[in-house]
């Protein structure tokens, strides 16, 4: 689900409706099902929208158990059909650089516990701060206005049965030829109509007044959560599925909407109406009527809560199967090419169907248990109405009550049936919303392992000298990457870091950029420990072209401008020319307005890398880091691009670090650092390292030399001219 939909979640309020309804189809292949509303909880039933009711209701939020799937990189495990496969797991990071562990999402405990009640209360207190902000009188005014309209609407709603009673008593007289309706009951009929109209009007005004309060609270909490997630360290994001995080935010914000709407539009009005009805019955007809009403409400509430708690077990099973099905479907579709490459369509369908079967089984239990809930609720309420009718009939026989009084009692009690019908749904959804909000607020409470110290100061660059001093680091405690790494990158020079795969070349950048912190040792820039400077100033001073180029699902212009959001179009075009991607862009039908697709999958790997180079050139930081920045380019484009980058670096005196497997791209570096087994094995210029027979660099160079030979400038120019001639002939 798109994250932006959170703010459009509808508010709910009780309204009269009956008949069947069908749930809206939601994201991640949620099933469509139907249920009958008779007076109790319904499968997936929620209160209708305040603005309109079209017969379709959104599904409820999912239980805490269903959120557990996103706590780690998750893949389903079911009995596979003929083609078994292995699954990969996301790497974890050592405890030294760990993030505060997430709150447990275990759901084996009962729904309502003492600790959970305390948590629920703390959530409500947090939410109250968003709907009653200290420095926003406009929001407070709207809350007061909504509550005033609520009370006025309920008072008028209770008057409707009184007008009905008056009409009945007025017509319960001998009728003559001169008798007219307006003479007997005209005023009462007019009052009856006015009361009903004003009740509805006040209800709609209440919804309109309170809507901005609820949506403002949703927006504020969602923005704060999203901002907090962006400030978390890399370990946190590597350990969680992005889809799971967005679903947690979405459910949490929907939970805010439901809690606000249920409290303002259901809980408070129902409690107020029950109190008023009991008071009226006791005042006008005696304590026995009020006692029957109070006992009925208590028994009805107790039965509904107990039965709903029992049914929640089945709902948890359905939610778990639903989440698993969503994970299977999304995982399969994202890896569409792999599915097709290995002809595993039937396997994926079988995996998905297994979750559908589990969902079907749980849904049948939900539907059948609904009958018990509806039957019990109907029995309790019908018994109460029968007792009321008996007491009323006795009053009429004794002469203490009129027929209109009997109608009044019936109408007063019957008006309570509608909000009580939703009691099961409100209770279940209220508990679920609190759980969903707890998950979201727990995300806000997590602390990032990488953050500014209280005394952090902005980085003061003097030239861009970088020094690693006795650095030790490991992603996994049992597999250290660096043991005692020490080297120095001179300011304003081009330095290359090379070595065998897995020696930690890319880790150098991750530590320098503070995606992770070293376990021990120091990393210095111009003599300043990077742990003592602000993250913002540090990361603004470093530009990186990563090995796996991250692109947004937007146009090319935006993806380049992302390096400097304040850059003009002309500056973007100039950066594209420097990155040798301008010609490619101009050949596209929509040029700079061309969408690159999700993760840039609609363009080639080489084009993605050149866009990344253009982006970092537009950022223009004093320190540049190229992590296999040209690995997807052909030899000719790579050579020209590197020549252009070198000219830029030479003219501006920037410190640049190149990580490369193709050694010919960094043979002109001022310094080459060779890593192996967590140490600096060798360092020097290209010529110095080649003069060390048997050295690591010498062996790597010889191995690559047998595969290809670096072309000269004349060969590059000649072959490019030949390609241009071929292209011209094709155009003709």
UniProtKB/Swiss-Prot annotation:
<dbReference type="GO" id="GO:0006879">
    <property type="term" value="P:intracellular iron ion homeostasis"/>
</dbReference>
<keyword id="KW-1133">Transmembrane helix</keyword>
<feature type="transmembrane region" description="Helical">
    <location>
        <begin position="285"/>
        <end position="305"/>
    </location>
</feature>
<dbReference type="GO" id="GO:0031966">
    <property type="term" value="C:mitochondrial membrane"/>
</dbReference>
<feature type="binding site">
    <location>
        <position position="475"/>
    </location>
    <ligand>
        <name>ATP</name>
    </ligand>
</feature>
<dbReference type="GO" id="GO:0016226">
    <property type="term" value="P:iron-sulfur cluster assembly"/>
</dbReference>
<keyword id="KW-0812">Transmembrane</keyword>
<dbReference type="InterPro" id="IPR011527">
    <property type="entry name" value="ABC1_TM_dom"/>
</dbReference>
<dbReference type="InterPro" id="IPR017871">
    <property type="entry name" value="ABC_transporter-like_CS"/>
</dbReference>
<feature type="transmembrane region" description="Helical">
    <location>
        <begin position="263"/>
        <end position="283"/>
    </location>
</feature>
<keyword id="KW-1278">Translocase</keyword>
<feature type="topological domain" description="Mitochondrial matrix">
    <location>
        <begin position="56"/>
        <end position="143"/>
    </location>
</feature>
<feature type="compositionally biased region" description="Basic and acidic residues">
    <location>
        <begin position="717"/>
        <end position="732"/>
    </location>
</feature>
<feature type="topological domain" description="Mitochondrial intermembrane">
    <location>
        <begin position="400"/>
        <end position="405"/>
    </location>
</feature>
<feature type="binding site">
    <location>
        <begin position="499"/>
        <end position="506"/>
    </location>
    <ligand>
        <name>ATP</name>
    </ligand>
</feature>
<keyword id="KW-0999">Mitochondrion inner membrane</keyword>
<feature type="region of interest" description="Disordered">
    <location>
        <begin position="71"/>
        <end position="114"/>
    </location>
</feature>
<keyword id="KW-0472">Membrane</keyword>
<feature type="transmembrane region" description="Helical">
    <location>
        <begin position="406"/>
        <end position="426"/>
    </location>
</feature>
<feature type="topological domain" description="Mitochondrial matrix">
    <location>
        <begin position="427"/>
        <end position="732"/>
    </location>
</feature>
<dbReference type="Pfam" id="PF00664">
    <property type="entry name" value="ABC_membrane"/>
</dbReference>
<comment type="function">
    <text>Performs an essential function in the generation of cytoplasmic iron-sulfur proteins by mediating the ATP-dependent export of mitochondrial Fe/S cluster precursors synthesized by NFS1 and other mitochondrial proteins. Hydrolyzes ATP. Binds glutathione and may function by transporting a glutathione-conjugated iron-sulfur compound. Plays a role during copper stress, in a manner dependent on the copper metalloregulatory transcription factor CUF1.</text>
</comment>
<feature type="domain" description="ABC transporter">
    <location>
        <begin position="466"/>
        <end position="702"/>
    </location>
</feature>
<feature type="binding site">
    <location>
        <position position="424"/>
    </location>
    <ligand>
        <name>glutathione</name>
    </ligand>
</feature>
<feature type="compositionally biased region" description="Low complexity">
    <location>
        <begin position="85"/>
        <end position="95"/>
    </location>
</feature>
<dbReference type="GO" id="GO:0016887">
    <property type="term" value="F:ATP hydrolysis activity"/>
</dbReference>
<feature type="domain" description="ABC transmembrane type-1">
    <location>
        <begin position="144"/>
        <end position="432"/>
    </location>
</feature>
<feature type="transit peptide" description="Mitochondrion">
    <location>
        <begin position="1"/>
        <end position="55"/>
    </location>
</feature>
<dbReference type="GO" id="GO:0005743">
    <property type="term" value="C:mitochondrial inner membrane"/>
</dbReference>
<protein>
    <recommendedName>
        <fullName>Iron-sulfur clusters transporter ATM1, mitochondrial</fullName>
        <ecNumber>7.-.-.-</ecNumber>
    </recommendedName>
</protein>
<feature type="topological domain" description="Mitochondrial intermembrane">
    <location>
        <position position="284"/>
    </location>
</feature>
<feature type="transmembrane region" description="Helical">
    <location>
        <begin position="144"/>
        <end position="164"/>
    </location>
</feature>
<dbReference type="Pfam" id="PF00005">
    <property type="entry name" value="ABC_tran"/>
</dbReference>
<dbReference type="GO" id="GO:0140359">
    <property type="term" value="F:ABC-type transporter activity"/>
</dbReference>
<feature type="topological domain" description="Mitochondrial intermembrane">
    <location>
        <begin position="165"/>
        <end position="181"/>
    </location>
</feature>
<keyword id="KW-0547">Nucleotide-binding</keyword>
<feature type="compositionally biased region" description="Polar residues">
    <location>
        <begin position="96"/>
        <end position="114"/>
    </location>
</feature>
<keyword id="KW-0813">Transport</keyword>
<comment type="similarity">
    <text>Belongs to the ABC transporter superfamily. ABCB family. Heavy Metal importer (TC 3.A.1.210) subfamily.</text>
</comment>
<dbReference type="InterPro" id="IPR036640">
    <property type="entry name" value="ABC1_TM_sf"/>
</dbReference>
<feature type="topological domain" description="Mitochondrial matrix">
    <location>
        <begin position="306"/>
        <end position="378"/>
    </location>
</feature>
<feature type="binding site">
    <location>
        <begin position="374"/>
        <end position="377"/>
    </location>
    <ligand>
        <name>glutathione</name>
    </ligand>
</feature>
